[in-house]
């Protein structure tokens, strides 16, 4: 009786033992977790996170470097000395400095226009001098005429410099006409110059 029970128990355990064996006779566990796949997924997630952190760090370093370069380009002001420099303060100073540069450029353009107008007027005077000089006889022929012409031109240039406004082309035209009228024979400045020409002591060569 006990022998038959032992045989039955042995036969009931054989199917379980056979389930634990693989077709090639090795033991296997069908419910064991897939460890390599799990590790691979975790490694990929860590790598993405590390890449994201590295990119974010590089982005912040680039921003900080840009702010540092901008800070070096902006001149220091008395109000910024001794104060903590923030990014907002750097941007504010940059905007203020740009406004100042625009004002300086505008003033420089106005000054350049004024200098160009003055240069144009001086070129015109130089051209007139050249024409007058070409019509003057040789010094050996008429020294007195040369000295008279020199006195007249010097006096004219002095009055021209004091009466002609070189600010703009419009002011040059307006004041130049007034200056030309002052050279009329009946004008007092011309009479004064003519009197100097007549009374000055000339010496013959």
Swiss-Prot record:
Segments forming domain bHLH: 47-101
Basic motif: annotated span: 47-60
GO BP field: determination of adult lifespan; negative regulation of gene expression; regulation of transcription by RNA polymerase II
Native organism: Caenorhabditis elegans
Biased composition (Basic and acidic residues): 45-58
Segments of skewed composition (Low complexity): 1-12, 26-40
Keyword Mitochondrion: yes
CDD domains per UniProt: bHLHzip_Mlx_like
GO CC annotations on file: cytoplasm; mitochondrion; nucleus
Coiled-coil stretches noted in the UniProt entry, renumbered to this chain: 98-132
Observed phenotype of the null mutant: RNAi-mediated knockdown reduces lifespan and is further reduced on a daf-2 mutant background. RNAi-mediated knockdown causes premature onset of polyglutamine-mediated paralysis. RNAi-mediated knockdown reduces spore levels of the microsporidian pathogen N.parisii during infection, further reduced on an mdl-1 mutant background.
Keyword Nucleus among UniProt keywords: yes
Protein known as: Max-like protein homolog 2
Region spans: Disordered: 1-58
Entry's Gene Ontology molecular function annotations: DNA-binding transcription factor activity, RNA polymerase II-specific; protein dimerization activity; RNA polymerase II cis-regulatory region sequence-specific DNA binding
Region Helix-loop-helix motif, annotated ranges: 61-101
Tissue expression per record: Widely expressed.
PROSITE patterns, per database record: BHLH (PS50888)
Family matches, as PANTHER family: BASIC HELIX-LOOP-HELIX ZIP TRANSCRIPTION FACTOR (PTHR15741), MAX-LIKE PROTEIN X (PTHR15741:SF25)
Compartments in which it is found: Nucleus; Cytoplasm; Mitochondrion
Function: Transcription factor. Binds to the E box motif 5'-CACGTG-3', probably in a heterodimeric complex with mml-1. Involved in modulating longevity in response to TOR signaling, dietary restriction, the decline in protein homeostasis associated with normal aging, germline signaling and the insulin-like signaling pathway. Plays a role in autophagy. Involved in regulating migration of the ray 1 precursor cells in the male tail, acting in concert with Wnt and semaphorin signaling pathways.
Keywords associated with the record: Coiled coil, Cytoplasm, DNA-binding, Mitochondrion, Nucleus, Transcription, Transcription regulation
